[in-house]
Design a protein with these regions (language model features):
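Bacterial N-terminal signal peptides that target proteins for export
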Residues: 2-16
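N-terminal (or domain-start) structured segment
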Residues: 27-117, 156, 164, 180-205, ...
Length: 326
């Protein structure tokens, strides 16, 4: 004889098994239609370049289009806000970035998203130092000359960025603070626009993403002063780092793949497996490194730790320079 208690228990067990089976089927069938990859940065920016390379491979491996959708504005906050509101069904993948995930929460008091509450990390895709550049026609030949000029002429030098709260903005803020100089910030809407402003002489310098910056350097429109990493890059051994002049200075740009928080875990697991395979592919890694982008492919937990650590770092910087934006 089966008691009411065991009848209830059996029903619960059956429901659990059905739920597990449904999740398995969801992951097995996924994706069954095109997937939107939301990039909160402009076409041609570092996050965009990485995402397009990886999205093409995802399309090939999983048999459905992974289509990049650039949603720009407010230092990436508009795009992240849209990602936070997306249906948690696996058909919107969101690109998180050092600026949107760890800088903006420390300088914007009223964000439309919460990096921890609204998103589930999948994997960090790349890390990359920024490239400090001036116009090719500039009289400033190196970092020491730039600092000397800034000290001799307080308030004269300017730097552009891809917008308030972006990595290029905070790289300039931290550099000026550590070098003991004053640099006037001129925000633009996109990273390519910030670089073009330097090349045309509208502003003195910028800290640009390497994929859009190097073509302008090679075209003799920009001059590279140095990378923002702690040590020189193996791919560019002749390019100095700013830390050779400003001791201890380091800023790494990075981005990664995320999902809206309530997306089924099985879908996240499947995407993680595919992304790790893609980022570990020698041809993809070579393509990325040629542009100064270093593949990562860590676990969701490791990516979450990076977000936590970087949030604490930029909180200290924002507090030290008393930076807060409406």
């Amino acid at each position: 004889m089966t008691t009411p208690f065991f009848k209830t228990l059996n029903r619960c067990a059956a429901l659990v098994l059905l739920s597990v089976a449904a999740l398995g089927a969801t992951a097995q069938d996924y994706p069954s239609k095109p997937v939107r990859v939301l990039v909160p940065h402009a076409a041609g920016s570092s996050p965009d370049v990485v995402t397009r390379i990886v999205a093409q491979k995802l399309s090939e491996r999983l048999g459905q289009p992974f289509t990049v959708d650039n949603v720009v504005g407010a230092g990436g906050s508009i795009g992240l806000g849209a990602g936070a509101k997306a249906a948690p069904d696996g058909y919107t993948v969101v690109i998180g970035h050092v600026g949107t995930l760890t800088i903006n929460p420390n300088i914007y008091p009223n964000l439309s998203y919460d990096p921890l509450r609204d998103f589930a990390p999948i994997t960090q895709s790349v890390t990359t130092p920024l490239l400090a550049v001036v116009a090719a026609t500039s009289a400033l030949k190196n970092t020491a000359e730039l600092i000397a000029d800034a000290k001799a002429n307080p308030g004269k030098l300017t730097f552009s960025s891809a917008g308030n709260g972006t990595a290029s903005h905070m790289a300039g803020v931290l550099f000026a603070s550590m070098a003991g100089i004053s640099l006037t910030h001129v925000p633009y809407k996109t990273a390519p626009a910030a670089l073009t402003a330097v090349a045309s002489g509208d502003v003195t310098m910028t800290f640009g993403g390497q994929p859009p910056a190097w073509p302008l350097v090679r075209a003799n429109r920009l001059r590279a002063l140095g990378l923002t990493s702690a040590a020189r890059a193996a791919e560019f051994p002749d390019v100095p780092v700013l830390a050779e002049t400003v001791k201890g200075y380091e800023v790494l740009d990075w981005n990664g793949f995320m999902l809206p928080k309530a997306t089924p875990v099985a879908i996240g697991t499947k995407l993680h497996r595919e992304l790790v395979a893609i980022l570990s592919d020698p041809d993809v890694a070579k393509q990325l490194r040629a542009q100064g982008l270093n593949p990562v492919a860590n676990t969701p937990a490791e990516f979450a730790t990076v977000i936590e650590r970087e949030t604490q770092k930029w909180a200290r910087v924002a507090k030290a320079v008393k930076l807060s934006l409406d």
